[in-house]
């Protein structure tokens, strides 16, 4: 094996920053939790069951705030949970219960 020694500083150092998600989602026994990792002044949460909008909520969500949705009350089905902010979908995930 050859040993290569590099000296000096690179002209353009590579900077990597870990990607922090804006929202962390989790599901436990039909209860969905959305934890906001930054504040959103007017975010909208949409819940679809089998492609039909069944719940919609919007408002201010503070950094560290957790929003919960009890999907068991709606019964079995395929659920899509979306979060929209400034007309952009920033989170979308699928669950089946």
In which residue ranges do the predicted regions lie?
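Conserved aromatic beta-strand anchor motif in extracellular beta-sandwich/beta-rich domains
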Residues: 47-49
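Short proline/glycine-enriched turn/loop motifs at strand-loop junctions of beta-rich domains
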Residues: 37-42, 74-76
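Residue-level detector of high-confidence beta-strand sites
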Residues: 56-58, 92
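Structural beta-strand segments of beta-rich domains
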Residues: 28-34
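Edge beta-strands of extracellular beta-sandwich domains
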Residues: 88-97
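Transition segment at domain starts
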Residues: 1-27
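Short, surface-exposed loop/turn motifs with a glycine/proline- and acidic-biased composition
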Residues: 60-82
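Generic short beta-strand
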Residues: 44-45, 81
